[in-house]
């Protein structure tokens, strides 16, 4: 039987001392996000996969994590929970505002590459010919836009003089459109196909307008509470997202979720209308072209 010499034993002890003691576990970093607003609400699947992947690739450095689904919440409610450090949420996904920049911790990487800033209209099927004739922003100003109560887009559109009708219930907005409470339901290119496909049988009057692309810069970020733990959660997620951008993982996930939407909506062929977003500040990373989708150059 061979016995280890003194140097081998010493080396073994040094290595073992660097490892966690048996049964010891690292503190689990917990990311709590809101639940979908209905069984048909799949708007956030891509964004949570981006976050989950960022946490996976940083596990060797940061240790274990878990993602917890809380209750359904409006954007207003999510912001309240984060700003007041209630513990009911530790992360939300929403567009930038000066208030959020001041009172929360953002990761300044547009999660959807600003694809959500390219919008199309859900309309009533019989109205398509009316929309075909629209050629200027003044033409669009004659229409009423449907949006959710408290959505950041409401103030953006009102700042450009558009007439906005709001509804407090996400599912109810689709019915409001069909009932002619407003002329169009403004939807992000990231959302509209799933919304239409999941509701077209129940609401056969729904139609995706097929000629217009409505754009404003809308960087959608992950936001965290302004606490020590919030800073840790944000630092880990940002590190993972930047690793994904560098090795191409980010683009691959984006393409898997978004390419068919970009192609099916024919974004390159639509006539585009642009308005400014007064919420966008100097911290917006416009200079890094890797972070921004452009339909004219997307391949």
Question: Positions of the model-derived regions?
Answer:
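Bilobed "Venus flytrap"/periplasmic-binding protein-like clamshell domains
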Residues: 40-55, 121-161, 173, 190
């Amino acid at each position: 039987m061979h016995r280890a010499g003194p140097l081998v034993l010493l080396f073994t002890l040094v290595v073992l001392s660097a490892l966690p003691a048996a049964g010891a576990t690292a503190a689990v970093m917990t990311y709590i996000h809101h639940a979908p607003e209905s069984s048909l609400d799949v708007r956030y699947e891509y964004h949570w996969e981006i976050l989950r992947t960022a946490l996976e690739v940083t596990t060797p450095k940061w240790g274990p994590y878990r993602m917890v689904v809380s209750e359904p919440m409006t954007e207003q409610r999510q912001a309240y929970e984060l700003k007041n450090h209630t513990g009911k949420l530790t992360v939300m996904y929403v567009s930038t505002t000066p208030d959020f920049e001041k009172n929360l911790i953002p990761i300044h990487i547009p999660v959807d590459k600003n694809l959500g800033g390219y919008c199309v209209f859900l309309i009533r099927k019989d109205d398509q010919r009316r929309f075909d004739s629209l050629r200027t922003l003044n033409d669009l100003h004659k229409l009423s836009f449907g949006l959710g109560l408290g959505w950041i887009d409401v103030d953006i559109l009102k700042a450009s003089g558009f007439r906005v009708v709001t509804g407090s219930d996400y599912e109810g907005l689709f019915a409001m459109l069909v009932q002619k409470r407003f002329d169009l339901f403004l939807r992000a290119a990231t959302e509209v196909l799933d919304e239409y496909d999941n509701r077209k049988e129940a609401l056969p009057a729904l139609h995706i307008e097929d000629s217009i692309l409505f754009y404003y810069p809308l960087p959608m970020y992950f936001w965290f509470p302004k606490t020590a733990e919030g800073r840790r959660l944000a630092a880990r997620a940002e590190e993972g997202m930047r690793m994904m951008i560098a090795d191409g993982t980010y683009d691959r996930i984006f393409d898997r979720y978004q390419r068919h939407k970009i192609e099916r909506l024919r974004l390159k062929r639509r006539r585009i209308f642009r308005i400014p977003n007064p919420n966008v500040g100097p911290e917006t990373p416009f200079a890094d072209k890797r972070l921004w989708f452009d339909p004219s150059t997307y391949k």
